[in-house]
Amino acid sequence: MYTLLKKTGKVRRGRFETVHGTIETPVFMNVGTLAAIKGAVSSMDLKEINCQVELSNTYHLSLRPGDDVVKKLGGLHKFMNWDRPILTDSGGFQVFSLAEIRKIKEEGVYFNSHIDGRKIFMGPEESMKIQSNLASTIAMAFDECVENPSPREYVERSVERTTRWLVRCKEELDRLNSLPDTINKKQMLFGINQGGVYDDIRIEHAKTIAKMDLDGYAIGGLAVGETHEEMYRIIDAVVPHLPQDKPIYLMGVGTPSNILEAVSRGVDFFDCVLPARNGRHGHVFTKHGKINLRNEKFELDASPIDEGCQCPTCKHYSRAYIRHLFKAKEMLAMRLCVLHNLYFYNTLMEDIRNAIDADCFEEFKNEKLKAWAGKA
């Protein structure tokens, strides 16, 4: 259940109660595609850096180790030793972005695995079954994520099919939640708004899915080729037409600046591979913007990544040491940077919540954007 604790303009401060614990919003979900954060970050590490929600991938876990294996081992929470909320995406984005030789039909999608080429079928029912086997806290509806830009006629047909798929997802998850051998009988379902860069299609779709009794609503199909200005315009168009008593999730976004802009437009949930991916390449976030620790200028820099940061990395290691680790190709370099970046994001969200509580979010946002000046 979502409780709107405070609203100032469009900015929302909320609390989302789940079977696996309470989520304070706005929140950033830390992406562990295969039930682990790339960069040797464990579930215990995630707790230390104040992660509220972990996000795992339905498509990838269905291939390795297999959702049936995870179910036999007690579900994703037991499998990865994590007792806080987990959101699993539906697999739709990966099917449409990674898989080869796709055939989209009303029943679902036929495609070849990006790992071994074997033929696979996934539709709404299959996606729900996999997510039920994984026993995540929140399941995402199976949808088609179209590229931006795509022809209007195709987007209209795709959105209509995505709506029909959502109805099937809800019916199937309701059925699965009632079965005696289901691990998480209180698994939640979020629907996904699509429509490419066409505001009117987006709005109509938002109105349609808002009539369904879902646990939350996501805005999908962004950060896939459109400009930041287009993304913000679409958020502005869609959010007013989604239920205001449910969480709103902007999928796959984004930079710290993107997050601040989206929070100011009424978004509650975020996820992105960016902080971990950047960290693995030595790009780290600071209060003054992003820096590249591989640069020679950090060779003798004994200061932490970000002065005043309380993450495990900044409390114990210097920029010079981490640069040395990258140059020596030591795996520890990636781990230390990923830990820092995820802590930076999680702390940013905590600071955002505190700013909303203190009625100073707009000042906080402007101060951050000015300090980063396009560098975050």
Curated annotation (Swiss-Prot):
Keyword Metal-binding in annotation: yes
S-S bonds: none
E.C. no: 2.4.2.29
Source organism, top-level taxon: Bacteria
Transmembrane regions listed in the UniProt entry: none
Start and end residues of each stretch annotated as RNA binding: 252-258, 276-280
Keyword Ribonucleoprotein tagged: no
GO molecular function: metal ion binding; tRNA-guanosine(34) queuine transglycosylase activity
Chain positions recorded as substrate binding sites: D89, S90, G91, G92, F93, D143, Q194, G221
SUPFAM superfamilies membership: tRNA-guanine transglycosylase
Catalytic activity: 7-aminomethyl-7-carbaguanine + guanosine(34) in tRNA = 7-aminomethyl-7-carbaguanosine(34) in tRNA + guanine
Assigned keywords, A-Z: Glycosyltransferase, Metal-binding, Queuosine biosynthesis, Transferase, tRNA processing, Zinc
GO biological process: queuosine biosynthetic process; tRNA wobble guanine modification; tRNA-guanine transglycosylation
Binding site for Zn(2+): C309, C311, C314, H340
Active site, renumbered: D89, D271
Record GO cellular component, one term: cytosol
Cofactor note: Binds 1 zinc ion per subunit.
Subunit structure: Homodimer. Within each dimer, one monomer is responsible for RNA recognition and catalysis, while the other monomer binds to the replacement base PreQ1.
Family membership noted in the UniProt record: Belongs to the queuine tRNA-ribosyltransferase family.
Name under which the protein is recorded: Queuine tRNA-ribosyltransferase
Organism: Clostridium acetobutylicum (strain ATCC 824 / DSM 792 / JCM 1419 / IAM 19013 / LMG 5710 / NBRC 13948 / NRRL B-527 / VKM B-1787 / 2291 / W)
Gene: tgt
